[in-house]
């Protein structure tokens, strides 16, 4: 629906507002709109090359996995029950606004989900076998300590800018 509307309206920029899933959706719409007639699934399965996309901006309203800083994207083909990743610099936004004040009104449950998401994505990389890099591990450990401490603060007061 988003790609079709983007093509019909001649969209030349996508502004994704929300969390990582909103950003990923905007990214996919940008790829599809810039490549009319090409199946997104064919791009993800590498049957078609992705050589152009629309510019995408991100306004984050939740702290979580950091999708807006990654070159990775995912697409789910519900018809066949598959989910694939796609890594390309074309997945990066032209800007990302990450203002903690935009998260102040989140319910505690959602704040907790964001804390867990940050920790789990950090641990995924931390426990990759056969990739020994002490400095990267130390950064991950520091991030986990910070998220635990700041997470406790945010759970007590969601409008604490220092959290």
Language-model features: locations:
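Glycine/threonine-rich beta-strand-loop-alpha-helix active-site module
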Residues: 4-98
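Carboxylate- and glycine-rich phosphate/diphosphate-binding segment that chelates Mg2+/Mn2+
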Residues: 72-163
């Amino acid at each position: 629906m988003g790609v079709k509307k983007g093509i019909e309206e001649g969209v030349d920029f996508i502004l994704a507002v929300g969390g990582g899933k909103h950003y990923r959706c905007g990214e996919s719409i940008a790829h599809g709109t810039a490549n009319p007639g090409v199946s997104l699934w064919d791009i993800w399965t590498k049957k078609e090359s992705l050589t152009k996309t629309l510019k995408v901006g991100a306004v984050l309203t939740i702290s979580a996995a950091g999708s807006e800083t990654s070159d990775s994207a995912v697409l789910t083909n519900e018809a066949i029950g598959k989910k694939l990743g796609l890594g390309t610099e074309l997945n990066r936004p032209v800007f990302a606004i990450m203002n903690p004040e935009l998260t102040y009104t989140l319910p505690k449950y959602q704040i907790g989900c964001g804390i867990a998401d940050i920790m789990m994505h950090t641990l995924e990389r931390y426990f990759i076998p056969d990739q020994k890099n002490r400095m990267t591990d130390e950064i991950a450990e520091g991030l986990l300590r910070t998220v635990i401490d700041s997470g406790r603060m945010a759970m007590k007061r969601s409008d604490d800018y220092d959290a």
